[in-house]
Amino acid sequence: MSGLDIYPHDPSSSSSTSSIDLSNEAFFSTGGLFLEPPGVSSSFFDSISSKCSDSEPLHFPGYWRNKTRLRSGKNFMFLSVSLSKDRSEQQCKKALAQNDEIPGKDNRKRSVIGGVRRRGTMNTRKHLWAGAVAAMVSKTFLAPLERLKLEYTVRGEQRNLLVVAKSIATTQGLTGFWKGNLLNVLRTAPFKAVNFCAYDTYRKQLLKIAGNQEATNFERFVAGAAAGITATVLCLPLDTIRTKLVARGGEALGGIGGAFRYMIQTEGLFSLYKGLVPSIASMALSGAVFYGVYDILKSSFLHTPEGRKRLIDMKQQGQELNALDRLELGPIRTLMYGAIAGACTEVATYPFEVVRRQLQMQMGKNKLNALAMGFNIIERGGIPALYAGLLPSLLQVLPSASISYFVYECMKIVLKVE
């Protein structure tokens, strides 16, 4: 409180001081009480006055007028308590803050939350674009090796790799090596975009839950597996259509739209999710191994004296460095670690890939499930049949993993992904 005024009133007093102007806004803005002296002890006023002694009271002249008179047969006093402007604002704000009711606070909160959400949405978009560009570059560059891989896994080629390559060049020309590449890019770009973005998102969430500053190896594997499952569920239909197009007779389906209509009309909507179970198993393992191995290698290097020195140098030079020099691992290590992670992933998941491709190629009513198909492949060709085409697949995966992770890391720097 900033001030305390006590106005005694006696009915026998003069008219100039015997009434209160009820229309005076300033008067009533201070607040007050009508008190009967017999019922109020002096200690009551002393206790209030002691709290108000640090500031001078505010006086509002002209309280007592003849215009409005309070009639009473007893003497009374009007207790007026007033606050100085500055302190009243401070005290009001303090009281409102305790109740979370500061004027404009909700608007500011909403503004801050809205800004965070917008930044988060923009960051997610940048993440997705970085992954998509990485997939487009790597897949287009390595399309010939991808085509050779499909010849072994889908058509069951047994001939030498060079013989198969010569056959494609002779019958279809050089463009034959890029057959199905557009669909492959359309399938892989969203898959990689979702995969990369989901991995970073899941890893950050696991860090928040655990309260750690750096992810453990277990958290890396879990985040990678979850990212692989997420991307598979969202993108499997495009992969199924692509497989149908490159198989024998696929040319007659009339492209992506024709293959889509054919599968829906003849086999139903769920035919687009052929091999979902082995795909999920394969991609969960693939994501866990790929991201886990890469991050373990990256973390191991960054904790070495050389790695710590590189981080310090990068921090000191800041924006003066170009995108390549701002790679934490540097260009060579980024490519090398990506290749190692890709090789480990391919060896671990290749049998699932073979089973999935064979499931997608099944026709007719008597269709095998994933487990039965696996045993069927082993019966026909033994364990090596599960790794048919592994060599061309590795030749394709090693540079693909290197390029995709390299381009992805560069795009994150260029797009300023947080």
Curated annotation (Swiss-Prot):
A GO cellular component entry from the record: chloroplast envelope
Disulfide pattern: none
Family per record: Belongs to the mitochondrial carrier (TC 2.A.29) family.
Compartment(s) of residence: Mitochondrion inner membrane
Organism encoding this protein: Arabidopsis thaliana (Mouse-ear cress)
Cited PANTHER family: SOLUTE CARRIER FAMILY 25 (PTHR24089)
One Pfam family named in its UniProt record: Mito_carr
Superkingdom assignment: Eukaryota
GO terms, biological process: transmembrane transport
Described function: Probable mitochondrial adenylate carrier that catalyzes the transport of ATP, ADP and AMP.
Primary site of residence: mitochondrion
Solcar repeats: from-to residues: 122-205, 215-300, 329-414
Ranges that cross the membrane: 127-147, 180-200, 221-241, 276-296, 335-355, 383-403
InterPro entries listed in its UniProt record: Mit_carrier, Mitochondrial_sb/sol_carrier, Mt_carrier_dom_sf
Name used for this protein in its record: Probable mitochondrial adenine nucleotide transporter BTL2
Keywords, in A-Z order: Membrane, Mitochondrion, Mitochondrion inner membrane, Repeat, Transmembrane, Transmembrane helix, Transport
Bilayer topology: Multi-pass membrane protein
